[in-house]
């Protein structure tokens, strides 16, 4: 298949891909249950001639050309975040959630790839399995689909995924071989005290005070207990307690994340969080417990497959369209679970910088982040062309 021709076809489809993206963006859903998004994706796939089925909370569809036994999986996530959107986009969300991580872009790009692949079905040297996944953000989606049998009947021998990246020049493809993204573990610390009147704190045990000391003490783990060259981040993004200014509450809750490239380091940090929380709480006459909520392992890109997909991008968009990273980043992604089951390639696609447009370049997960829709055809083309080339080269 000629890459230049395929890219031209994709550019002609731009309006449709953008329309699909905006429809998904306008009605974001969070978590593992995405009924409206699933229905939308299934309807679009049926219109293209696919026979989609629901699996593990997501959607799966296959397309076979020549029956060779070869199969590659293309995956897009489609869940949103509990962020109230503050953009001025005419298709902005108004339901209190937001596609602030670009998963609407991913789903639309895979739908675009589905149309391209269908148009070239007779040229496929095997099967392409399309996977639309829920709850990447909560780290349960990939595991649920794997448990439900997404790697069965037919069994793929490779998998690929794309993720848009705000702050990177539009259309630039970033890739890295080996460990490309950190693993992430979500945790919750529950601090128990004794509620009382705010005027008489001596009659109770203040869980907010205890939790504040725990929060500060946990900063010492990465600063003083790990080697300086060991990448690790402990972030506590949620701290909740109480309902009134004059009442000392019964309980305080901290939720956070641990990010590392090494599962043993994660285990060490989680153990120390438990020890520090327990000791600190007891020092102030309270108690604390720590629980692991969910996790994703470090993402490991297969070197050969990743290089092949990078070369596909260069063939489509030019030699200067790809930047090969020498080391991974501290972001996390539950596509990582696939990377321990079969060879995988996970690439980033630049979605705009502030130098291009003042609206672009804001942080991922920000309430005002805006992604450049002009990159959508590139994403669709790379997914489709990468799959076709992999099937062709496996002969």
Label the predicted regions.
Residues 2, 13-20, 33-44, 70, ...:
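General structural feature for long, well-ordered alpha-helical segments within catalytic domains
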Residues 212-395:
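Metal-dependent amide/peptide-bond hydrolase catalytic core
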Residues 2-100, 104, 108-124:
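Acidic/His- and Gly-rich active-site-bordering loop/insert found
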Residues 59, 81-83, 88-98, 104-105, ...:
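Histidine/acidic-residue-rich, glycine-tolerant segments that coordinate divalent metal ions
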Residues 73-75, 187-189, 346-351:
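Non-cysteine beta-strand/loop elements that form the S-adenosyl-L-methionine
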Residues 24, 61, 74, 103, ...:
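Divalent metal-coordination and catalytic microenvironments
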Residues 114-120, 152, 339-341:
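Alpha-helix C-terminal capping segments
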């Amino acid at each position: 298949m000629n890459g230049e021709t395929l890219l031209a076809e994709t550019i002609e489809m731009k309006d449709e891909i953008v329309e699909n993206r905006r429809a998904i963006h306008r009605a974001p859903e969070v978590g593992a249950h995405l009924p409206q998004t699933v229905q939308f994706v299934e309807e679009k796939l049926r219109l293209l001639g696919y026979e989609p089925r629901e699996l593990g909370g997501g959607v799966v569809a296959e397309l076979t050309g020549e029956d060779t036994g070869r199969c590659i999986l293309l995956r897009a996530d489609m869940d949103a975040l509990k962020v109230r959107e503050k953009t001025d986009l005419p298709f902005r969300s108004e339901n209190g959630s937001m596609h602030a991580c670009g998963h609407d872009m991913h789903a639309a790009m895979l739908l675009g790839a589905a149309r391209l692949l269908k148009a070239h079905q007779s040229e496929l040297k095997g099967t392409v399995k399309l996977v639309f996944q829920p709850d990447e953000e909560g780290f349960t989606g990939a595991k649920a689909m794997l448990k439900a049998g997404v790697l069965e009947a037919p069994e793929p021998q490779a998998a690929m995924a794309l993720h848009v990246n705000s702050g990177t020049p539009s259309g630039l493809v970033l890739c890295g071989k080996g460990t490309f993204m950190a693993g992430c573990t979500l945790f919750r610390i529950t601090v128990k005290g004794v509620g009382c009147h705010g005027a008489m704190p001596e009659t109770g045990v203040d869980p907010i005070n205890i939790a504040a000391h725990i929060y500060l003490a946990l900063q010492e783990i990465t600063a003083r207990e790990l080697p300086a060259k060991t990448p690790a981040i402990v972030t506590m993004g949620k701290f909740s307690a109480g309902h009134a200014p004059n009442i000392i509450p019964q309980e305080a809750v901290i939720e956070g994340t641990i990010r590392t490239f090494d599962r043993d380091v994660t285990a060490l940090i989680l153990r120390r969080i438990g020890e520090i929380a327990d000791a600190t709480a007891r020092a102030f006459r309270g108690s604390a417990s720590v629980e692991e909520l969910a996790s994703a392992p470090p993402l490991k890109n297969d070197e050969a497959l990743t290089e092949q997909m990078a070369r596909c991008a260069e063939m489509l968009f030019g030699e200067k369209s790809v930047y090969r990273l020498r080391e991974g980043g501290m972001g996390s992604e539950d596509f990582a679970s696939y990377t321990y089951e079969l060879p995988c390639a996970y690439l980033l696609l630049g979605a705009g910088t502030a130098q291009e447009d003042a609206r672009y370049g804001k942080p991922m997960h920000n309430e005002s982040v805006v992604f450049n829709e002009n990159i959508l055809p590139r994403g669709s083309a790379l997914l489709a062309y990468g799959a076709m080339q992999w099937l062709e080269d496996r002969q």
